[in-house]
């Protein structure tokens, strides 16, 4: 029977529940167990697709086209199992489903209530992941912090599951903070005690307590936590701040967390084989070279807005035994000064995805700087579209060329709305989303990089290269080296008269892994190392 692990958080938010769940999943998978993982987000939005990156960070896109929380990116990178639309559930989705059932008459005229209707729907979403994947273990992260009113239905649902399927099949793991007070030079356990007390008041007794801390926890403090929280001493796990998130699986392995999990759930499995993972972490900690790459965007004040892009660059650095230093450049600042001033000295320039007119001219200037100064360039989604606009304006002589997203009256709308998008008015969940095939053109840079004729990549966009201008752009020297299988949609552009200039409509960052970097990022970082 499938076992279920529930990860909750207390004291403060952003403690690293997602990393904890991912790291545990990594260990269990490396012990030969099959693992599925999901996250519940308590907000009422259906998904984060229409939320500002300043509010939520990046939107991670799955193969099946779900727009999800950035923690799902951590899940895939650590566990290397694809997540799906069932892997991220919001309160909005739960209530949407329940209300639709009520309208259909599924509840036979009964009064619809949080208990049992909402809690049953939550449990159904957990069981659905188990039915879909048939794993040995399902790990479910509960977003938010214990004590938040929004999280109460989820906590009640997972409390009920202990009775529904038997306590031997359920494990509760609570992540909490042990703050350090500089004034007294002490670690304090009281916030954690109160967090566990709050959780127990709901009816959940944690089996494992994961303590986030800046400093190591003494044995006496672990004994104190075990006593006051009624948790076995061996199940008090310290998680000291690490230099790299990829050290976390090794740290909790040293604490014996995986053994404790298997003991509580009554499972047997061989020890985790972390040989390759250790080698990867060793490469992170012992780089032999360094490269600096500028990420030019408009959300750079919050790096989480470009989390997968930054991680993909670091993954490529791992492969090349290089430290990738990221220079975050606000594209709006380029508009007010000069690209040369803000980009001087970088070995590569990357323009990631985004939406809206703000900062666009700065991105275009950054791309021009990369093209004219032969600096390796990688554009992603909007980064490809702005690369086409820059080329049209400054090489092909199309004065004021633009995207119809930014200027509906542009004389040269080299980027235009996808035909199937023109009748769509709703914003949420209506873009071209998920994995699609890309046909590569022979004898191009990208065909040599991928070593394949057809690749499969994840997308999230409404706009495309306007086919009306393709011939003129190609005449100017731009190469459309990847298209949809029918040739209608441009997927990749490159500029042969440049050491390394590639841009993709898709998002390659979503398929990068720390031990298997994405080909485009791998070769981009390689080019930047040669350009130092």
Curated annotation (Swiss-Prot):
Domain of life: Bacteria
Classification via Pfam families: CTP_synth_N, GATase
Residue ranges of every copy of the Glutamine amidotransferase type-1 domain listed in the record: 292-532
GO biological process, alphabetically ordered: 'de novo' CTP biosynthetic process; pyrimidine nucleobase biosynthetic process
Positions that bind ATP: 14-19, 71
Annotated UTP binding sites: 13, 188-193, 224
Subunit structure: Homotetramer.
Any further remark recorded for this protein: CTPSs have evolved a hybrid strategy for distinguishing between UTP and CTP. The overlapping regions of the product feedback inhibitory and substrate sites recognize a common feature in both compounds, the triphosphate moiety. To differentiate isosteric substrate and product pyrimidine rings, an additional pocket far from the expected kinase/ligase catalytic site, specifically recognizes the cytosine and ribose portions of the product inhibitor.
The protein's name: CTP synthase
């Amino acid at each position: 029977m499938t076992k279920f692990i529930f990860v909750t958080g207390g004291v403060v938010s952003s403690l690293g529940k997602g990393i904890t769940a991912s790291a545990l999943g990594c260990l269990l998978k490396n012990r030969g167990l099959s693992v599925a993982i999901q996250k519940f987000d308590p907000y009422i939005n259906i998904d984060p697709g229409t939320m500002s990156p300043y509010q939520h960070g990046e939107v991670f896109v799955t193969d099946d086209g779900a727009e999800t929380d950035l923690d799902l990116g951590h899940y895939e990178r650590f566990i290397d199992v694809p997540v799906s639309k069932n892997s991220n559930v919001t309160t909005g989705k739960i209530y949407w489903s329940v209300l639709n059932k009520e309208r259909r008459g599924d509840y036979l005229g009964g009064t619809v209530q949080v208990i049992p209707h909402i809690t049953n729907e939550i449990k159904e979403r957990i069981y659905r992941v188990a039915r879909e994947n048939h794993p040995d273990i399902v790990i479910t992260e509960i977003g938010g912090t214990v004590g938040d009113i929004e999280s109460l239905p989820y906590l009640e649902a997972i409390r009920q599951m202990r009775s529904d399927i038997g306590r031997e099949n359920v494990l509760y793991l609570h992540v909490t903070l042990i703050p350090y007070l500089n004034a007294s030079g002490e670690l304090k356990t009281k916030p954690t005690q109160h967090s566990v007390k709050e959780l127990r008041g709901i009816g959940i007794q944690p089996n494992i307590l994961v303590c986030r801390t800046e400093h190591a926890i003494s044995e006496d403090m672990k004994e104190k936590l075990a006593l006051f929280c009624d948790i076995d001493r061996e199940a008090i796990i310290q998680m000291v701040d690490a230099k790299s998130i990829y050290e976390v699986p090794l740290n909790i392995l040293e604490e014996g967390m995986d053994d404790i999990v298997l003991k509580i759930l009554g499972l047997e499995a061989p020890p985790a084989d972390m040989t390759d993972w250790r080698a990867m972490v060793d490469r992170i900690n012992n780089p032999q070279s360094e490269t600096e790459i500028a990420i030019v965007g408009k959300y750079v004040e919050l790096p989480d807005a470009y989390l997968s892009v930054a991680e993909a660059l670091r993954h490529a650095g791992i492969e090349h035994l290089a430290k990738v230093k990221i220079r975050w450049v606000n594209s709006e600042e380029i508009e007010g000064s000069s690209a040369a001033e803000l980009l001087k000295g970088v070995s590569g320039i990357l323009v990631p995805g985004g939406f809206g007119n703000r900062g666009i001219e700065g991105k275009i200037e950054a791309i021009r700087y990369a093209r004219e100064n032969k600096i390796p360039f990688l554009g992603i989604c909007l980064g490809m579209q702005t690369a086409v606009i820059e080329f049209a304006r400054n090489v092909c002589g199309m004065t004021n060329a633009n995207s119809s997203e930014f200027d509906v009256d542009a004389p040269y709308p080299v980027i235009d709305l996808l035909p199937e998008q023109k009748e769509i008015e709703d914003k949420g969940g209506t873009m071209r989303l998920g994995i699609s095939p890309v046909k590569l053109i022979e004898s191009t840079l990208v065909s040599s990089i991928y070593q394949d004729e057809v690749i499969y990549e994840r997308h999230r966009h409404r706009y495309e290269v306007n086919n009306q201008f393709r011939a003129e752009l190609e005449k100017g020297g731009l190469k459309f080296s990847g298209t949809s299988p029918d040739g209608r949609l441009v997927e990749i552009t490159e500029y042969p008269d440049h050491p390394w200039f590639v841009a993709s409509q898709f998002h390659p960052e979503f398929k990068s892994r720390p031990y298997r970097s994405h080909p485009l990022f791998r070769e981009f970082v390689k080019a930047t190392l040669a350009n130092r």
